[in-house]
Design a protein with these regions (language model features):
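Positively charged n-region of N-terminal signal peptides that target proteins for export
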Residues: 1-4
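Sec-dependent N-terminal signal peptides
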Residues: 6-12
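C-terminal motif of bacterial Sec signal peptides marking the signal peptidase cleavage site
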Residues: 15-16
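N-terminal secretory-pathway/extracellular module detecting exported/lumenal segments
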Residues: 20-103, 113-140
């Protein structure tokens, strides 16, 4: 028993202090406030966020997705509303929880003056450069 306690303690230190095998050179997003990230540009890529092949990489889990969506406006500063529709579209990522796999989240997004709501695809596992999608603006 006397040997078991130091052995368990040592294993916590050894395994708990190892570095991640996934490296990132991406800078964490700047926040406007605790629930909104700071965006600085609108994407010129018309597929950005609108397809599962080109999702918005928010990182930060569900909170990261909400911080991103809270930063969006309509093109003329209109207030944006959104509803999570669910998850889809399994993909491989070193940041996935089970078997290096993640799922994209689909959000229905709208603002006043938009004829039809749009669906945006967000990746909460990986972080990339975030911009507002085409036909959107962002809070300043």
């Amino acid at each position: 028993m006397r040997l078991l306690i130091p052995l368990v303690f040592s294993s916590f230190i050894f395994f708990g202090c190892r570095t991640s095998s996934v490296s990132s050179t991406h800078t964490p997003p700047v926040l406007l406030d605790s629930s909104t990230i700071s965006l600085t540009a609108v994407s010129e890529d018309s597929s950005y966020g609108y397809t599962e092949k080109n999702p918005i990489q928010t990182g930060g889990g569900a909170a990261g997705e909400r911080r991103y969506l809270n930063a969006l406006t309509g093109p003329n500063g209109e207030t944006v509303t959104y509803v999570r529709l669910g998850s889809c579209c399994a993909f491989k990522t070193p940041n996935g929880i089970i078997n290096n796999t993640g799922l994209l989240d689909k959000y229905e997004v709208r603002y006043e003056g938009l004829n039809k709501s749009v669906i945006l695809y967000l990746n909460m596992y990986d972080t990339g450069e975030m911009k507002a999608p085409v036909n959107f603006g962002y809070k300043k």
